[in-house]
Amino acid sequence: MPQLTKSAELFEKAKKFIPGGVNSPVRAFKSVGGTPVYMAKGSGAYMTDVDGNTYLDYVGSWGPFILGSMHPRITAALEYTLKNIGTSFGTPIEMEIEIAELLCKIVPSLEMVRMVNSGTEATMSAVRLARGYTGRDKIIKFEGCYHGHGDSFLIKAGSGALTLGAPDSPGVTKGTAMDTLNATYNDIDSVKLLVNENKGQIAAIIIEPVAGNTGVIPAKPGFLAALRELCTEEGIVLIFDEVMCGFRVALGGAQSLYGVTPDLTTMGKIIGGGLPVGAFGGKREIMERVAPLGDVYQAGTLSGNPLALTAGLETLKILIDENPYPELERKAVILESGFNDNLKKLGLNYVQNRVGSMSCLFFTETPVVDYSTAVTADTKRHGKYFHSMLDQGIYLAPSQFEAMFISFMHTDEDLEKTIKANYNALVASGQ
């Protein structure tokens, strides 16, 4: 069991100055209990905390580190930019064009793209754009899906909101709530019902094509295509939120994996290489409504800053040059198979969902296909599992409802260590 003396001291100090002691709620360990671990250093597939304990990292900064932490090419590129270019200008820079052109080549739906500073900014901007383009007010999202902390999205939300048991947030006005309609993930009939009840009023349907903030929930075959058809028929803007799954499940995102092209796409995480970034883009006729070309306003002081773009560009270039996806899939299969073997040995029927290198082990025997089935998971048992894994040097997201990420830097030996730890943790969590 790792000693967390300094982490505990830092957490007590942090609570005096930072709400809850953290800058993002799930980091506080509220759903799993115990003391949050304060990290001091990361390298490759490992992190070291302030007490000197080392962990295999399956959080990957919650998604961006598909290539692991401190990748030498990304680090070198950042050092060059810092020394020779600068951190920010508040002016256009050539690098903006380079990353925009590259994104438009990679992602099927992109004809134009705008850089922002976070995934939340990207989704908020995309929804505003859809409303401006259609002249309609209402949006449809899906129960348990998380699209950042914008007011429109904190209605039956996932991620930290679900983890803390508060999927609806105070401070969201009744008017905003009335304009946000919730459908059931993987249930096209629930979407059609809302569309028919609000005929001509729906501006956008926004969805994670791989739901990654209710654990991991893949879209059922045909579901995304049915959404595409419905949106086309009804003049609704289809938005894929690929902040998490974009460039993770495939280079071109889930839309290339499933062969369904949305009208707008939001991106983040991997395209920042570990630095704050986001982007939204899509059809030219819609994107041309964005200011200053059009009348839908969006702006950001640090949008397109050299450091974030450098990390993002280098990450994308590595993904193109080295094509790590077959190797990531091989590693993901090893881990998935190992976990399933452990479950079988112990007579457990827990559900494991996976798409590419993102996965989730749900502590439930109910197949997890949407929000209502995800919340059947035993969070107390998951908490015991989490701490047993932590004690064995495996760092997972401190929530049942978050993804586990494999990076290119995880070795086969790392995976075997994780599989052994998984067996022990399943035993420790109770059967």
UniProtKB/Swiss-Prot annotation:
Cellular localization per UniProt: Cytoplasm
Keyword Transferase: no
Gene3D superfamilies for this protein: Aspartate Aminotransferase, domain 1, Type I PLP-dependent aspartate aminotransferase-like (Major domain)
Pfam families found in the cross-reference section: Aminotran_3
GO cellular component: cytoplasm
GO biological process, one term: chlorophyll biosynthetic process
Catalytic activity: (S)-4-amino-5-oxopentanoate = 5-aminolevulinate
Matching InterPro entries: 4pyrrol_synth_GluAld_NH2Trfase, Aminotrans_3, Aminotrans_3_PPA_site, PyrdxlP-dep_Trfase, PyrdxlP-dep_Trfase_major, PyrdxlP-dep_Trfase_small
Domain of life of the source: Bacteria
Keyword vocabulary terms for this entry: Chlorophyll biosynthesis, Cytoplasm, Isomerase, Porphyrin biosynthesis, Pyridoxal phosphate
GO molecular function: glutamate-1-semialdehyde 2,1-aminomutase activity; pyridoxal phosphate binding; transaminase activity
EC number: 5.4.3.8
Quaternary structure (record): Homodimer.
Family to which the UniProt record says this protein belongs: Belongs to the class-III pyridoxal-phosphate-dependent aminotransferase family. HemL subfamily.
Name by which UniProt lists this protein: Glutamate-1-semialdehyde 2,1-aminomutase
